[in-house]
Design a protein with these regions (language model features):
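Bacterial N-terminal signal peptides
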Residues: 10-19
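Bacterial N-terminal signal peptides that target proteins for export
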Residues: 1-9
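Folded, non-transmembrane soluble domains that reside on the lumenal/extracytoplasmic side of membranes
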Residues: 23-149
Length: 149
């Protein structure tokens, strides 16, 4: 992944900081890190920076913020990238607090596809459909076909 997409991921996290307005809650023990780069797009430093930012936002507001990159979402669910995101979120016990509130961005590199999944009342309050549309506008144009560089 080149600078442009890395910057977009940072902008995504920054937008989450501005949008989330819930109180802090205890973490439920997700089986994945806040940033899971299975596709190998990020350098070690970039991964650590994004991880720290996501962890800070998640703990401060009680809404888990996750970025997951995979080679192919079909490895997790064959019926679509959104269902793959849903599956990863639930199978890996992601989310903050007793209700597992969180938002997850999944990037599937092989087919240049992505999905955003929002779970829990805190997340749904902070990221209603209007908020999600606004957030998507920050990065969606750049995640189109062949615009990952």
């Amino acid at each position: 992944m080149k600078k442009r997409t890395r910057c977009l991921l940072l902008v995504f996290l920054f937008c989450l900081v501005l949008c989330v307005g819930a109180a802090a809650a205890e973490q439920t023990g997700a089986q994945l890190s806040y940033v899971t780069d299975a596709a190998g797009l990020l350098s070690e430093n970039e991964n650590m920076l994004l991880e720290k930012m996501a962890e800070s936002v998640s703990q401060k507001y009680g809404v888990g913020v996750y970025i997951v990159t995979v080679e192919d979402y079909r490895d997790f669910h064959s019926e679509g990238v959104y269902k793959a995101t849903y599956t990863i979120y639930h199978e890996c016990t992601m989310g903050e607090g007793p209700n597992r509130d969180g938002i997850m961005l999944l990037l599937s590199i092989d087919d240049r596809d992505w999905a955003m999944f929002c779970y829990g009342s805190r997340c749904e309050y902070a990221f209603n459909s209007y908020g999600q549309e606004k957030l998507e506008k920050v990065f969606l144009d750049n995640f189109g076909a062949n615009d990952w560089d």
